[in-house]
């Protein structure tokens, strides 16, 4: 999977550049590129394929607020530039409603913005009780958050820690042990 933030879309193609035959067709958009998988995403940051249900999940930066975590949905539209997900433009003007029918709905929204960055769906031995939960890093409030969810239903959010190591840019899980590694903007790696 490849994403293209500049054009507010997610693109899906094979590593060799070929387009999957089952990519969606958007109604009334016959001239759109065949690799487009989903539209209406403002500023995608993190993406992971769940080892539990094989669905793709992502984090997105809103403008001033309106960050979200949700599922990348085949052929659907998250509504960017029509919807503001609760955020406002940097000038303070309203972007649009948080959500409305006809658009994909995120699992979790953040207003004010946390500047959601990377994310993973946790699978490991180190924190077995977290298996299947989303671990989401943030830049603005420098936090690691755990989101418990079931399909598209938000259950709970826990801030594991905040304001301790700086702006967290990336998260990786050691496959064999489930240990968590965090990478900050300063280039530090934390375990």
Which residue ranges define each predicted feature?
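Conserved blade-register residue in beta-propeller folds
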Residues: 11-12, 71, 146, 191
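Single conserved hydrophobic/aromatic residue that forms the stacking wall/gate
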Residues: 1-13
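Blade-edge beta-strand/turn elements of extracellular beta-propeller
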Residues: 11-43, 94-111, 149-164
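Short loop/turn segments immediately following the C-termini of beta-strands
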Residues: 61-63, 139, 185
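Blade-level signature of beta-propeller repeat domains, shared across WD40, Kelch, NHL, RCC1
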Residues: 174-191
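Loop/turn-rich, solvent-exposed surfaces of beta-rich toroidal or solenoidal domains
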Residues: 90, 94-153
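Beta-rich, blade/repeat-based domains predominating
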Residues: 36-55, 111-132, 164-178
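Residue position within the beta-strands of beta-propeller blades
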Residues: 58-59, 136, 182
